A protein has these predicted regions:
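An N-terminal hydrophobic leader/cap segment in hydrolases
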Residues: 45-117
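Short beta-strand element of the alpha/beta-hydrolase
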Residues: 139-149
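The serine-hydrolase catalytic nucleophile loop
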Residues: 150-164, 175
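Conserved alpha/beta-hydrolase
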Residues: 164-182
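Alpha/beta-hydrolase active-site loop
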Residues: 186-207
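Alpha/beta-hydrolase fold nucleophile elbow
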Residues: 207-218
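Hydrolase active-site cap/lid region
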Residues: 226-282, 291, 296
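Serine-hydrolase catalytic core
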Residues: 277-357
Length: 366
């Protein structure tokens, strides 16, 4: 030991003093090494966390704006025996497509690209089909536009025409990045709104329907709400399996499809989409635009087993927003239906709910 003067204490040998100093130095060195290790681990964790977040944001945003396209290319004639008019492409190409694809549910391509007759305000070419109603009401008869969901196309959404075809003209079209329409980033509504408006412009130029409604499935419903908020030509809306807020789509796909936590992945993906498109998708959530419908009626259909757009966070939220704003609204739930499968699980109910709603919305027809 040492005295307060720093000299060896009485009775302490020089070796004991040296050993004591060495022990103290060792303890201090050990503490420094411990702090360095903790700092290193924290730094590595930070780097790993930042790397993971950046990876999820980059990959997730790319997958969401560039979905794998639906390979179904069946036309109304092939699928249901219906006559139809092609929108913005030559009908002879359908024969070419059919001969090249014996299995039209799994086509190698969607055919020739759309022409120049229907172009959006940002230069995207849109293709579709016009299917006259079975009752022969003619082009001025009540018309329903079908807007498909994320990664789908006009062939996939055609099934919704089955209960409508008897009394309504029906239009099915490809959003950007799907079917015959131009390749462009998918944006879950804000730019798809322009695609829908281009189709309505075509209808107005060529058919002059007396009444017009839009049925949107999932993402298509979001685009329909955004369009209807500013386009009074849309007299009524049907939302099938449609989200309330865009961030919920991202978080649920992360959790359900990819097995990743919603945090920090959701904000990272939304940030990645902003970097790629310049759009803050949280500014385009349908629930925020539903009040703009005013007195135009809204029908909400949803499945109780939808794990992608949970009813409590989508259908219920949209319904309450409509009620609060005084929008005439109906809500029907299909027991056991998953996302986008209300019409598959409850086909009779879907038809009854939709046709009755449209009859009330359009009123008596001559």
């Amino acid at each position: 030991m040492t005295s307060s003067t720093g000299l060896p204490a009485a009775g302490a040998t020089e070796s004991e003093s040296t050993e004591g100093r060495g022990t103290a130095v060792g303890r201090r060195r050990g503490r420094r090494i411990g702090r360095l290790m903790i700092g290193l681990v924290a730094a590595l964790a930070l780097v790993a966390g930042v790397g993971y977040t950046a990876y999820v944001g980059a990959v997730g945003s790319d997958q969401l704006i560039h979905p794998t396209g639906n390979s179904d290319c069946r036309t109304p004639l092939v699928r249901y025996g219906w006559t139809y008019e092609p929108i913005n492409y030559d009908i002879t190409d359908d024969a070419v497509l059919r001969s090249a694809n014996p299995d039209m549910e799994n086509c190698s391509s969607q055919g020739a690209a759309a022409g120049t007759e229907v172009i959006t305000s940002d230069g995207v070419r849109i293709a579709g089909w016009y299917v006259p109603s079975a009752d022969g009401s003619g082009p001025t008869g009540p018309t329903v536009v079908l807007a498909h969901g994320w990664g789908a196309n006009k062939s996939e959404v055609l099934k919704y025409a089955v209960p409508l075809h008897a009394a309504f003209n029906v239009v099915a079209f490809d959003f950007r990045n799907g079917g015959r329409s131009s390749a462009a980033a998918t944006t879950f509504g804000p730019r798809e709104k322009q695609d829908l408006e281009a189709i309505i412009d075509w209808l107005e130029r060529t058919k002059h329907p007396a009444h017009l409604a839009v049925m949107g499935n999932s993402m298509g419903g979001g685009a329909a709400v955004l369009a209807a908020a500013t386009d009074q030509r849309i007299e009524a809306l049907i939302l099938d399996s449609t989200h309330a807020r865009v961030e919920d789509i991202v978080s649920r796909r992360l959790e359900v499809d990819a097995g990743h936590p919603s945090l920090p992945g959701t904000p990272a993906i939304l940030f990645g989409i902003w970097l790629r498109t310049g759009l803050n998708l949280m500014d385009s959530s349908p629930v925020d635009f539903i009040p703009a419908l005013g007195h135009r009626p809204l029908l909400i259909l949803h499945g109780t087993a939808d794990v992608h757009d949970l009813p409590a966070r989508s259908a219920d939220v949209n319904y309450q927003a409509a009620l609060a704003a005084g929008v005439p609204v109906e809500l029907h739930m299909c027991e056991g239906a998953g996302h986008g499968h209300v019409i598959d699980t409850c086909p009779v109910d879907w038809g009854r709910w939709s046709v009755d709603f449209l009859d009330r919305a359009f009123g008596p027809t001559d």
